[in-house]
């Protein structure tokens, strides 16, 4: 199984890339994380948020791995604990399907994509910069894996 993070946005600051890379390099070979950046749509010319999200949805769908479990990150999603994520990882591994975590653009994710998701997940109740979400998600995936392995990284 492979973990994918599909994120609308590109040209992130160096500290975002460094933080993200720090956690992805710690992941074991059987749970590699691959980032797929989706170029955001411009909101110029009076385009509505709905048309921007629909265009971004098409780009996301084109980048989704075939047959992957979709975990869409959304402010109205379920509030999982790290332990719940740690419990999901082995179940997902047994299932054998790749898992694609989807981070939307500035306007969020298109409702059609959210409806199609296997899991709608909230990473925080606070509003976060999209680049920061990549780092937090990578860290939480590493922490969840470390819990499943009784690795000392997670000490709670």
Swiss-Prot record:
The keyword S-adenosyl-L-methionine applies. S-adenosyl-L-methionine binds at residues 73, 104, 123-128. Signal peptide: none annotated. Its EC number is 2.1.1.177. InterPro entries: Alpha/beta_knot_MTases, RlmH-like, tRNA_m1G_MTases_N. Keywords: Cytoplasm, Methyltransferase, rRNA processing, S-adenosyl-L-methionine, Transferase. Homodimer. This is Ribosomal RNA large subunit methyltransferase H.
């Amino acid at each position: 199984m492979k973990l994918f993070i599909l994120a609308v946005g590109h040209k992130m600051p160096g500290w975002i890339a460094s933080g993200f890379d720090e956690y992805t390099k710690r992941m074991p070979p059987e749970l590699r994380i691959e980032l797929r950046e989706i170029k955001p749509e411009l909101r110029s010319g009076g385009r509505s948020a709905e048309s921007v999200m629909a265009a971004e949805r098409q780009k996301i769908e084109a980048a989704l791995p075939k047959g992957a479990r979709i975990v869409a990150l959304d402010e109205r999603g379920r509030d999982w604990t790290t332990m719940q994520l740690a419990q999901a990882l082995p179940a997902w591994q047994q299932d054998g399907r790749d898992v694609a975590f989807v981070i939307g653009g500035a306007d969020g994710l298109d409702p059609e994509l959210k409806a199609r998701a296997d899991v709608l997940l909230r990473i925080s109740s606070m509003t976060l910069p999209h680049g920061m979400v990549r780092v937090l998600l990578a860290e939480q995936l590493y922490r969840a894996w470390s819990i499943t392995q009784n690795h000392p990284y997670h000490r709670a």
